[in-house]
């Protein structure tokens, strides 16, 4: 059994989608990220005090705690032998696009969301800076998907899960800032539709309730 600490965020949904795709048994522990105080068992699993985090209790004598969404998805994929090619070019490209998300779409879209929607003061320069960079990243993805069915190549993988949750969220919540940049991205929109139609993705986006 895997213990999952999560919340309703793009990073949290990465873990629930992966767990659903891999048909792993897990229990959900909803972390209220609006509160400063967090449960001690969560902090033990996530020293950075961020969701998601998991504790793999398959071996009760030696449970394994993992934090950071990219590390979690790689661990789960390697544990099951699914969603991550074992070697060669396919693995290298899947890993590259997995961690491209960690360093690019997550931080840029997250900052755009903060400055456009939550910052107490609107700073036009900051908003435009993150709009421009986010638009560039959408173009990078569209170009990749022009030549490949999925981000890692021919097969659906953790790279798609990692990126999908953020791109789908941006398409919905940042429509005012980025809507126009989705309109001329046929391959990106095709990928969004295909990934979004997967049963595990649909279910993962409902957890926690």
Task: For each feature predicted by the language model, list its residue ranges.
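Basic/polar N-terminal segments that are highly enriched at the extreme N-terminus
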Residues: 1-3, 193, 209
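Charged phosphate-binding loop/patch that engages nucleotide di/tri-phosphates or the phosphate backbone
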Residues: 194, 201-204
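Phosphate-coordinating loops and pocket residues in cytosolic domains that bind phosphorylated ligands
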Residues: 44, 197, 206-207
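GST-like domain detector, emphasizing the conserved glutathione-binding G-site
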Residues: 1-128
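Short coil/turn segments at secondary-structure boundaries
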Residues: 110-111, 206-208
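GST-like fold's C-terminal all-alpha helical module
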Residues: 76, 98-197
């Amino acid at each position: 059994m895997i213990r999952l600490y999560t919340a309703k965020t793009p990073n949290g949904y990465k873990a629930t989608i992966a767990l659903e795709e891999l048909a792993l048994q897990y229990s959900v522990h909803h972390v209220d990220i609006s509160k400063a105080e967090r449960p001690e068992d969560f902090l033990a699993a996530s020293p950075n005090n961020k969701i998601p985090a998991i504790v793999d209790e398959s071996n009760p004598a030696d449970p394994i705690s993992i934090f950071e969404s990219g590390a979690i998805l790689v661990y789960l994929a390697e544990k099951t032998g699914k969603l991550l090619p074992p070697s060669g070019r396919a693995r290298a490209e899947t890993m590259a696009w997995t961690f491209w998300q960690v360093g690019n779409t997550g931080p840029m879209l997250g900052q755009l969301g903060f400055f456009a929607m939550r910052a107490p003061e609107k700073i036009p320069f900051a908003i435009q800076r993150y709009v421009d960079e986010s638009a560039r990243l959408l173009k990078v993805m569209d170009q990749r998907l022009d030549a490949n069915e999925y981000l890692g190549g021919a097969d659906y993988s953790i790279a798609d899960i990692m990126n999908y949750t953020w791109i789908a969220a941006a398409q919905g919540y940042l429509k005012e800032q980025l809507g126009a940049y989705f309109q001329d991205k046929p391959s990106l929109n095709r990928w969004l539709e295909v990934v979004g139609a997967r049963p595990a993705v649909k279910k993962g986006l409902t957890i926690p309730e």
